[in-house]
Amino acid sequence: MKLEKGLIHVYTGEGKGKTSAALGLAMRAVGRGLNVLVQQYFKLESEPSGELAWKEGLKGHPALEGGEAGHLIFRRGDYRHPFFDKNADRAAIRAKILEQTALVAAEMKAGYWDVVILDEFNNALRDKFVDLEELEALIDASPEEVELVFTGRGAPVELIEVADYVTELHAVKHPGTRKIAARKGIEF
């Protein structure tokens, strides 16, 4: 299955659930035969995560063997955001982000992906690791039938204006304010 027309989604805001919302879309897309790339920025290859464990657990699952299921690939950089790593080399991080983004653009042009999720890309824009011209080039590189999904805090107005779907998540209540630590299987 291929999409006739891909649209642009933005999940942003200070609330929890931006990546989770995008992964829900990914599950639905794969189940309907679409090929999905989840490109995760600011996340270490070695860092354990529930979404990667979930993907590994699906290998060989009868529902995904044959039939109409698509493919789901997770790809991460191997760097942290300077907020979490005060010794991070901003220039090196920017170079890695641009390298990853160029690969995504090339793969989209080659027809590998029906849905591309750029997880935490909004943060890269907000914090000037990627500029608006580079964002525009990425969107322009996307074939018309590819669905693009941008997640992360601080989506710029320019991205919001070109998006077809924009969801801003707000934390109304969160256990972190009561000093309850992030829990395995729920927050990560």
Task: For every predicted segment, state its role.
Residues 6-106:
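Conserved P-loop
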Residues 42-45, 79-80, 122-123, 154-157, ...:
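Conserved nucleotide-binding/hydrolysis micro-motifs of P-loop NTPases
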Residues 83-147:
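Phosphate-binding/switch loop-helix module in NTP-utilizing enzymes
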